[in-house]
């Protein structure tokens, strides 16, 4: 299952996950762009057994003078509380940075649910993330930032979730009160948030430093 595609410096990167028995594994392959044939080679492989991977959006990024890829990795077991998002030892529910030379990764940010959109705009990193039953988020990503899932969310738990597994009152609404980073904006109800792109300033004098955000539920574009 292909998750994301990135073209950079005449190379094409594809992220995907494969299933073996009861596990799913996250992979990235890369190929030099050639109109006759694409010969993909392994770029990054995770040996972590995941419940179901999602997202997989990639962006080129320079972190501490090292070139690499930022990669958003979500999990598919959305309706059940999980320790993965707050566990720094796993890549699940994280945005990771993969060094282009060493192919080693670090956890760049944590506490994500399903970060479907990822954009690097200069020094700013912007992510869009599906919330539960509402609470879709636009986040400004900072290094080692914690975005709260599954403890804090402006969404509500699905009916098939035992709310007592989360807390007696469901998800915490305020992120900052618990030491997490607040979203730049949260959509309640959900819009089925997807990728975000920057509109070139040359497009319109009225739309300077604006972004376009796509919505799956509404089949609409939002200008921000």
Predicted regions and their residues:
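Short beta-strand elements that form the blades of beta-propeller/WD-repeat-like
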Residues: 11-16, 212-213
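Short, solvent-exposed loop/turn segments that connect beta-strands within catalytic domains
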Residues: 6-7, 22, 36-37, 63-67, ...
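Residue-level recognition of a conserved intra-blade site in WD40 beta-propeller repeats
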Residues: 7, 60-63, 120, 198
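Blade-loop segments of beta-propeller domains
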Residues: 1-9
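Aromatic- and glycine-enriched pocket-lining scaffold segments that form the walls
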Residues: 55-74, 93
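Beta-propeller domain segments
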Residues: 2, 68, 75-224
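Asp-box/WD-like beta-propeller blade repeats and closely related beta-sheet repeat scaffolds
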Residues: 22-62
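Beta-strand C-termini and the immediately following turn/loop, strongest in propeller blades
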Residues: 16-18, 129
């Amino acid at each position: 299952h292909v998750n994301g595609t990135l073209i950079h410096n005449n190379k094409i990167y594809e992220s995907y996950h494969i299933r073996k028995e009861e596990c799913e594994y996250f992979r990235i392959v890369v190929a030099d762009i050639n109109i006759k044939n694409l010969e993909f080679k392994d770029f990054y492989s995770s040996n972590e057994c995941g419940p179901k991977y999602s997202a997989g959006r990639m962006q080129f990024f320079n972190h501490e003078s090292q070139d690499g890829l930022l990669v958003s990795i979500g999990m598919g077991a959305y309706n059940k509380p999980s320790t993965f998002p707050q566990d720094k030892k796993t890549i699940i529910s994280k945005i990771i940075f993969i060094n282009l030379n060493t192919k080693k990764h670090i956890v760049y940010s944590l506490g994500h649910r399903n970060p479907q959109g990822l954009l690097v705009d200069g020094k700013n990193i912007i992510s869009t993330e599906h919330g539960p039953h509402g609470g879709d988020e636009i986040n400004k990503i900072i290094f080692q930032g914690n975005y709260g899932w599954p403890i804090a969310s402006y969404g509500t738990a699905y009916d098939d979730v035992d709310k007592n597994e989360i807390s007696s009152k469901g998800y915490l609404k305020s992120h900052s009160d618990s030491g997490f980073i607040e979203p730049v904006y949260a959509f309640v109800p959900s819009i089925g948030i997807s990728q975000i792109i920057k509109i070139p300033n040359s497009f319109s004098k009225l739309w300077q430093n604006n972004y376009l955000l796509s919505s799956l539920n509404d089949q609409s574009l939002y200008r921000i």
